[in-house]
Amino acid sequence: MPKTLTEKLNAIKAAGKGIFVPYIMAGDHEKGLDGLAETIHFLEDLGVSAIEVGIPFSDPVADGPVIEEAGLRSLAHGTSTQALVETLKTIETEIPLVIMTYFNPLFQYGVENFVKDLADTAVKGLIIPDLPHEHANFVEPFLANTDIALIPLVSLTTGIERQKELIEGAEGFIYAVAINGVTGKSGNYRADLDKHLAQLHQVADIPVLTGFGVSSQADLERFNAVSDGVIVGSKIVKALHQGEPIQDFIKQAVAYQK
């Protein structure tokens, strides 16, 4: 596997394919965290580009009802940040993992300890949706000599100069937030969304992935056309929990040719 998340995603981009990153909630499995490796390998076998792994939190301000409920199920299974870290140490995969966590669980664990404990795992990225750009210095110094990238989230309502500020020096990929509000609100897009995505894509020197509300074949086609790929969360989480078939959707996403 390429050493960094950026290298992995750039290789997919160079091959003329769309990047596809599914989101899963750690511990949202009938086996709790004991089922995490099974889910990761299921997605890996389908050819996904990377996997976003959520840490459950009791006050998930950016999450819609599907992911919020998944977090509550995970917490009910006894998932903790410490237990997740220990589980990740045991999982062997060629797919880079990206941790999505609110700052509170990270703060409680200790940012430096968290980064050190993940050093020899497949984790190559970190998303903290409630960490303002101005406070990135709480985390970035601990990532400086690692292969873990701090992923910026960029709202498409943000002006171009602010976008440039948010993505300056970023690694991994840029998470373009397609909707205003929480995850899972499919189809609630701005009329000028494509224009703003294209604008962000022009000023970025790493892959731009679109997320929040992406759930249909039409969404895959639309956002692959104006960005480098997509992140899908609620649709994946719901299907895995309810035992619904999701393989065909993932295969279509993975096979998308630019």
UniProtKB/Swiss-Prot annotation:
Annotated active site: E52, D63
EC number: 4.2.1.20
Cellular component aspect of the GO annotation: cytosol
InterPro entries recorded: Aldolase_TIM, RibuloseP-bd_barrel, Trp_synthase_alpha_AS, Trp_synthase_suA
Annotated Pfam families: Trp_syntA
Substrates-to-products reaction catalysed: (1S,2R)-1-C-(indol-3-yl)glycerol 3-phosphate + L-serine = D-glyceraldehyde 3-phosphate + L-tryptophan + H2O
Pathway(s) of this molecule: Amino-acid biosynthesis; L-tryptophan biosynthesis; L-tryptophan from chorismate: step 5/5
Keywords: Amino-acid biosynthesis, Aromatic amino acid biosynthesis, Lyase, Tryptophan biosynthesis
Family indicated by similarity: Belongs to the TrpA family.
Function per UniProt: The alpha subunit is responsible for the aldol cleavage of indoleglycerol phosphate to indole and glyceraldehyde 3-phosphate.
Name of the protein in question: Tryptophan synthase alpha chain
